[in-house]
Structures are given as structure tokens and as C-alpha cells.
């Protein structure tokens, strides 16, 4: 069974290197199919064997199966051809994890393989944290597979910290 690491951060984003350069917008229900196509293209067959599997997973997120979907803090980047390039799907409260109570969760961060390493993921995270901060959430969490070195490096570079249940009273200042 795959193991996950829980990371937390405060929602103040002092590490922003430059102004937002991408035309991001909140995810809407109309983005379901575009997100499913992106998800299917970004993962290997063991995660989503078919487009329908990816579509079902997206439906569970947007319909609140994992917790209340947080569309304002779920930015999406659509290219000039109307295709989803990247998306970050957030929840106001995640129902199926052991993270900090009442803390929004960055659930899925997906960038199309051909557009990775362009700083898009960092902008999506910063956008989501800015929204959360504006809406009076002091902290956010995410869960990263122990084997996903690239994602772990990204979050740690952005100042996220490892969290365990023993740290329950600690959230970054």
C-alpha cells in the first residue's frame, strides 16, 4: 500500500517570486470533462486505466465525496485551444484523511506532461493559498505520495512542513 506524507503551511504566501503571470480562473462544474482528460493524460494506466475511471474520480471530487469542494481555491489553466493545461483541486475540509482539523486541503495538483517545469504548479498553489487567506483560513494541508519526489520537493521549496498527528497543536505561523 502506498504511503503518504502530510504537509502543512500557513496561507500567507511570502515566497511568491513574481506577480501572477498566468490567466488562472476558479474551476467550475463545466470543467469536469477537461479535468478528467487532463487527469487521464497525467497519470499512468495503473492509476486510471480508462478515461471513464478518471471521469468518475473527478465526479467524486466535485460532488463532495472526499469533502466539500472548494471551487474558489481550485484554479485551472486553459490554453488557447480550450484544453486544460493544469488544475489544482482543493477541498474546504477533507473527510478521508488524518490531517489537521478544519484545514483546507490541496487534493489534486495536475499539470499536463508537456507543460511541466514551467512554474505552473507553483502559481496554482500560490493562487489557492491567496484565496484561502482572503477567506480567513490560516493554514492548508496536502498529502504527497512518499514516492513522488518532484511534488515533495516543490512543496518543501515553497515552505510547506511535514505534519503528523502528534503535531496537532502546531500549525505554521
PLM feature spans:
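Conserved acetyl-CoA binding element of GNAT-fold acetyltransferases
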Residues: 91, 99-113
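Acyl-donor-binding surface of acyltransferase catalytic domains
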Residues: 1-22, 169
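Conserved beta-strand-loop-alpha-helix junction that forms the acyl-donor binding cleft
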Residues: 113, 141-152, 168-173
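Conserved acetyl-CoA-binding loop-helix of GNAT-fold acetyltransferases
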Residues: 108-111, 117-130, 134, 152-157
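Conserved GNAT acetyl-CoA-binding A-motif
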Residues: 132-143
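Conserved GNAT-fold acetyl-CoA-binding loop/helix
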Residues: 43-62
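A short beta-loop-alpha structural element at the N-terminal edge
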Residues: 23-37, 48
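A short helix-loop-beta-strand connector motif used in the catalytic cores of GNAT acetyltransferases and
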Residues: 63-76, 86, 105
Amino acid at each position: 500500500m502506498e504511503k503518504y506524507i502530510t504537509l502543512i503551511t500557513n496561507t500567507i504566501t511570502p515566497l511568491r517570486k513574481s506577480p501572477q503571470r498566468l490567466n488562472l480562473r476558479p474551476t467550475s462544474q463545466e470543467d469536469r470533462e477537461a479535468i478528467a482528460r487532463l487527469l487521464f493524460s497525467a497519470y499512468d494506466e495503473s492509476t486510471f486505466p480508462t478515461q471513464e475511471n478518471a471521469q468518475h474520480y473527478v465526479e467524486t471530487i466535485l460532488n463532495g465525496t472526499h469533502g466539500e469542494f472548494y471551487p474558489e481555491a481550485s484554479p485551472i489553466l486553459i490554453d488557447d485551444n480550450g484544453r486544460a493545461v493544469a488544475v489544482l483541486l482543493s477541498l474546504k475540509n477533507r473527510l478521508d484523511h488524518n490531517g489537521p482539523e478544519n484545514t483546507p486541503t490541496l487534493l489534486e495538483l495536475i499539470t499536463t506532461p508537456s507543460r511541466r517545469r514551467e512554474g505552473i504548479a507553483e502559481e496554482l498553489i500560490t493562487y489557492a493559498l491567496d484565496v484561502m487567506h482572503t477567506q480567513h483560513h490560516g493554514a492548508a494541508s496536502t498529502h504527497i505520495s512518499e514516492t513522488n519526489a518532484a511534488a515533495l520537493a516543490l512543496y518543501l521549496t515553497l515552505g510547506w512542513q511535514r505534519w503528523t498527528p502528534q503535531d496537532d497543536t502546531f500549525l505554521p505561523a
